[in-house]
C-alpha cells in the first residue's frame, strides 16, 4: 500500500 497515494491502495 502506498502512503503517497490519495488512498491507501495500489495504483492501477
From Swiss-Prot:
GO biological process terms, semicolon-separated: regulation of blood pressure
Q: Could you tell me which residues carry Pyrrolidone carboxylic acid?
A: 1, 4
Arranged from A to Z, the UniProt key words for this protein are: Hypotensive agent, Metalloenzyme inhibitor, Metalloprotease inhibitor, Pharmaceutical, Protease inhibitor, Pyrrolidone carboxylic acid, Secreted, Toxin
* Tissue specificity: Expressed by the venom gland.
Question: Where's it found, cell-wise?
Answer: Secreted
Q: Name one GO cellular component term.
A: extracellular region
What GO MF annotations does this protein's record show?
A: peptidase inhibitor activity; toxin activity
Q: Which family does it belong to?
A: Belongs to the bradykinin-potentiating peptide family.
Miscellaneous notes: Bradykinin-potentiating peptide 9a-F is present only in female snakes.
In Swiss-Prot or TrEMBL terms, this protein is called: Bradykinin-potentiating peptide 12c
Lineage here is: Eukaryota, Metazoa, Chordata, Craniata, Vertebrata
